[in-house]
A protein has these predicted regions:
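Beta-loop motif signature
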Residues: 2-48
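Active-site-adjacent structural segments surrounding the nucleophilic cysteine of cysteine proteases
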Residues: 3-4, 21-24, 58-121
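Short glycine/serine- and small hydrophobic-enriched flexible loop segments
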Residues: 28-31, 95-100, 137
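Boundary regions of SH3-family modules and the immediately adjacent low-complexity/disordered segments
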Residues: 44-61
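Catalytic cysteine-centered active-site loop
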Residues: 104-152
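Active-site-adjacent substructure of cysteine-protease-like catalytic cores
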Residues: 142-200
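Noncatalytic regulatory segments and standalone regulatory/sensor domains
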Residues: 184-242
Length: 242
């Protein structure tokens, strides 16, 4: 599974000891594999001398989080004081998706401006149909809209990512919200929730279905699909143009 690092991340050797001479840099496109028997995630990342593999105890640092952007305005008619924190999950979902697909670290301000210019900023959120259309033009991507879990699963296993349109059924949000399906680690779907905050998944229902590892979520694909029921489309399947 590929994912963008959004912060400097400390790493360990395969035995779990800290490796003070190595680190993952913000902007690195990384390949993360399922946990080892030692409970560590292998991460392969670029260096000046080629790729290197080290290990991390959790998936912290791999998320563009809208909660960090309370000072970045994202106005819409009727929501003139809105910010990326209050209404920009779609913006940060797009940053997470583009980073994982292309290795391009897109500044949130740049993605915010893109959403506004293309008319994707609407009262209450982001028009993802319009924004993904612009992402395809700007970053050389392709997008297929889908309502089928089987198509989502096949797409992720072939190396794509998906922006997922949750319906506020209480698992990932109590209101409409965008999250990103990054791929699978073992049999679990790895999800980037741009609205993640401390304690969000600590309720009994969420805790039973979703495991938080650092800044990313691990869950069953069916759990995500159930939370998207009622949305059309449920999934924006994004991939690079061959």
């Amino acid at each position: 599974m590929k994912v963008m690092a959004f912060a400097k991340i400390a790493v360990r050797n395969k035995n779990g000891a800290p490796d003070g001479k190595s680190y993952i840099a913000a902007g690195d496109l990384c390949t993360v594999s399922d946990k080892t028997l030692a409970g560590l995630y292998p991460v392969t990342y670029p260096t000046a001398r080629g790729s290197k593999t080290r290990w991390v105890a959790s998936l912290k640092g791999f998320l563009c989080n809208q909660n960090a952007y309370g000072g970045l305005s994202y106005p819409a008619p009727g929501y003139l004081s809105a910010t990326v924190k209050s209404g920009g999950c779609g913006v940060c979902a797009a940053v997470n998706a583009v980073g994982a697909l292309t290795g391009k670290s897109v500044p949130v301000r740049e993605m915010r401006d893109l959403a506004i210019r293309c008319g994707a900023r609407v009262p209450g959120g982001t028009d993802m149909k319009r924004l993904t259309g612009q992402l395809c033009k700007t970053y050389g991507l392709k997008c297929v809209q889908s309502n089928h879990l089987s198509e989502l699963t096949e797409h992720l296993k072939s190396g794509g990512v998906a922006i997922c349109n949750t319906a506020g059924r209480g698992m990932f949000s109590t209101g409409g919200h965008y999250v990103v399906a990054l791929g699978f680690l073992g049999d679990k779907l790895c999800v980037a929730d741009p609205g993640l905050y401390a304690g969000k998944y600590s309720t009994a229902r969420r805790r039973a279905a979703v495991r938080v590892s650092g800044d990313l979520l691990l869950t069953d694909a069916a759990t995500l699909d159930a939370d998207c029921v009622g949305r059309w489309p449920r999934y924006y399947l994004l991939g690079e143009v061959n």
